[in-house]
């Protein structure tokens, strides 16, 4: 059983809880998720099974889309509704001011991750330190916000969709927006709508999965990687690439870009893995047969 299941994670459980449930249903130990969703959050959580655990990092590279409900006027230590309230303020803002400030975050930004996160610094998870009352300096990380679509502003609440890169913390985004508005803000609700190429419309609820039907909800490994461009190789190259040989044939190299991963097939139908061209030629980067 190898592939990816697009699970609809409910609120109130951890991402690892979902992994544990899938292990029980599938009766297989090799199961992993493709990016943590906080217990407060719900939505798309792709779960990799069997050989598909080898592509966790590649799926995580994809874009994410979230529906965010943010509450202005409140600041907490966790940057969400579940934390200890540190400050509350009256809001004297107009919807236009709020929208203008939020839209400023579209593009490349430097974001400081929250203390209450699974990120490790010097081998320690930040949330373990935070629970001990220890706060340490965190370096800002480059992230990209592709788009923000504001759905409603009913102060103190704002609902918007955000499409973002890997590594984006929505709680930090809310905190930063609140800081810019001088009002404070917390993430009130969060739903992941997409974890490319998976979307919420096709996600399956945990309670609807069982030992009998789980296979029908498994997406094959190559389909889970469809964000990567397809490359078909002639049958004569099969043994070479499977043995790790670098291809220098111009018929292969002239049609592809350098330093870009390709979803690689033999003769259009036999998927073998992800390959890449570098200065020396083309080679399979991750064998997935």
Swiss-Prot record:
Active site: 38 (nucleophile)
Example of a GO MF term: RNA binding
GO biological process terms held by the UniProt record: mRNA pseudouridine synthesis; tRNA pseudouridine synthesis
Entry EC number(s): 5.4.99.25
InterPro entries given in the database record: PsdUridine_synth_cat_dom_sf, PsdUridine_synth_N, tRNA_psdUridine_synth_TruB, TruB_C
Presence of the UniProt keyword Isomerase in the record: yes
Statement: the UniProt record of this protein carries the keyword tRNA processing: yes
Domain of life the protein comes from: Bacteria
Reaction catalysis annotation: uridine(55) in tRNA = pseudouridine(55) in tRNA
Signal sequence annotation: none
Keywords: Isomerase, tRNA processing
The protein's enzyme class: isomerase
Family indicated by similarity: Belongs to the pseudouridine synthase TruB family. Type 1 subfamily.
Function: Responsible for synthesis of pseudouridine from uracil-55 in the psi GC loop of transfer RNAs.
Protein name per the record: tRNA pseudouridine synthase B
């Amino acid at each position: 059983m190898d592939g990816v299941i697009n699970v609809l994670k409910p609120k109130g459980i951890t991402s690892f809880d979902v992994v544990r449930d899938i292990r029980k249903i599938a009766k297989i130990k090799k199961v992993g998720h493709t990016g943590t969703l906080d217990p407060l959050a719900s939505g798309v959580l792709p779960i990799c099974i069997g050989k598909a655990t080898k592509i966790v990092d590649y799926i995580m590279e994809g874009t994410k889309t979230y529906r965010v409900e943010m509450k202005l006027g409140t600041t907490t230590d966790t940057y969400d509704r579940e934390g200890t309230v540190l400050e509350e303020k009256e809001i004297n803002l107009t919807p236009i001011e709020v929208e203008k400030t939020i839209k400023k975050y579209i593009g490349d930004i430097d974001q400081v991750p929250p203390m209450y996160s699974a990120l490790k610094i010097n081998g320690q998870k930040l949330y373990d330190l935070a629970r001990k009352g220890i706060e340490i300096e965190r370096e800002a990380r480059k992230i990209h916000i592709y788009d923000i679509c504001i759905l409603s502003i009913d102060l103190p609440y704002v609902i918007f969709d955000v499409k973002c890169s890997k590594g984006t913390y929505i709680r930090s985004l809310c905190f930063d927006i609140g800081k810019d508005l001088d009002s404070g803000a917390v993430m009130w609700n969060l739903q992941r709508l997409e974890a490319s190429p998976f979307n919420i419309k096709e996600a399956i609820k945990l309670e609807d999965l069982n030992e009998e039907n789980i296979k029908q909800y498994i997406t094959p490994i190559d389909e889970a990687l469809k964000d990567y461009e397809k490359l078909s190789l002639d049958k004569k190259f099969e043994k070479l690439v499977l043995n790790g040989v670098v291809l220098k044939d111009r018929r292969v190299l002239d049609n592809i870009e350098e330093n870009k991963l390709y979803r690689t097939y033999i003769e259009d139908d036999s998927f073998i893995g992800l390959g890449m061209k570098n200065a020396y030629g083309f080679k399979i980067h991750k064998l997935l047969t």
